[in-house]
Amino acid sequence: MDERAVLEELKKYRKMDLKYEDGAILGSMCTKPHPITKKISDMFFETNLGDPGLFRGTKKLEDEVINNIGKFLNNPNPFGYIISGGTEANITAMRAINNIAKAKRKNHKTTVIMPETAHFSFEKAREMMDLNLITPPLTKYYTMDLKYINDFIEDRNNKNDISVDGIVGIAGCTELGAIDNIKELSKIAEQNNIFLHVDAAFGGFVIPFLDDKYKLDNYCYEFDFSLNGVKSMTVDPHKMGLAPIPAGGILFRDKSFKKYLDVEAPYLTDIHQATIIGTRSGVGVASTWGVMKLFGEEGYKNLASECMDKTHYLVKEAKKLGFKPVIDPVLNIVALEDDNPEETSLKLRKMGWFISICKCVKALRIIVMPHVEKEHIDKFLGALTEVKKN
């Protein structure tokens, strides 16, 4: 095949894909990247951060990106990487917790407390590292029960039983957008010398830029490195940061945690490697750097406000039609109660609407990303009404 034939053939496959701007993708935490990232991708498409000594400029960009993200997360000296996404970031944090625990006690099964609303990546980490995961009950606000956590840790300490090595708090859970009380979790972690990881894959590029008028009294919005107990955080630029996929992020409080991640790689220009994936494109790093420079703090504040306004519009219009949200929106994520979400979701898909469902509650899940407009919301609610009538 010649070049033209190859491109024409590829176009056929691309036409099979949904496009964000059409508004039918309502269940994804990703969105159409900022247009500047096309030009940046062309510039950095051959870079490989798996061998940073060969791509020193791109590595310098990564360091700057981590520092810039650290600034709005109140961490002046962050250590971390731009990696494939939230899954790799969460597994990396669990790897750090596991290695720290093993360094203290050789024959010890690492125990981590996390909510049942935690992302599926933690289940992958459990399988990989044979972790012992403890899931406390949820409050009516779909956050972890703090009393249960305190009692569980105290009971373990009193019995000299297997200690707790890690806690995971969620800042914008995948299904509902709820935010665990990271401030209180930080206190618990500090008092008991426990590693606290915050999964802010979604919320990391929303919460710091959220106007106070959108904040609910039932949730604590303090979640970042200003809390001394927080040791690591997942935050994904390819979600609300408008970077192209793949551009996830893992940040640690400082570089002292690197030794728990490093493996030797003597045949590369840097003899140690800490990320799970070895070969890493520099496109995500450079694109994140570019979008963050373009947007700045004000740009992300405006983006968060626009998405929250549309989120509240969705809830208001849904209520008029008799659809009830599971909780008031904490972030730009809405869960609408439904007796049979699997069936409803399947019917909507046949009509061209792609939403998702929750596992912790019977509900339809809608993410109001930047590509979602009010006209899309109106059309979707019309389709949902039609489905429920039939």
Curated annotation (Swiss-Prot):
Record PROSITE patterns: DDC_GAD_HDC_YDC
Pathways per UniProt: Cofactor biosynthesis; methanofuran biosynthesis; Cofactor biosynthesis; coenzyme A biosynthesis
Gene Ontology MF term list: aspartate 1-decarboxylase activity; pyridoxal phosphate binding; tyrosine decarboxylase activity
E.C. code: 4.1.1.11, 4.1.1.25
Requisite cofactors: pyridoxal 5'-phosphate
Record GO biological process: carboxylic acid metabolic process; coenzyme A biosynthetic process; methanofuran biosynthetic process
Residue list for modification N6-(pyridoxal phosphate)lysine: K239
Keywords on record: Decarboxylase, Lyase, Pyridoxal phosphate
Catalytic activity: L-tyrosine + H(+) = tyramine + CO2; L-aspartate + H(+) = beta-alanine + CO2
Keyword Cytoplasm: no
Source organism superkingdom: Archaea
Gene3D superfamilies recorded: Aspartate Aminotransferase, domain 1 (3.90.1150.10), Type I PLP-dependent aspartate aminotransferase-like (Major domain) (3.40.640.10)
NCBIfam families linked to this entry: tyr_de_CO2_Arch
Protein role: Catalyzes the decarboxylation of L-tyrosine to produce tyramine for methanofuran biosynthesis. Can also catalyze the decarboxylation of L-aspartate to produce beta-alanine for coenzyme A (CoA) biosynthesis.
Family: Belongs to the group II decarboxylase family. MfnA subfamily.
PANTHER family, sorted: PTHR42735, SPHINGOSINE-1-PHOSPHATE LYASE 1
Descriptive protein name: Probable L-tyrosine/L-aspartate decarboxylase
Gene: mfnA
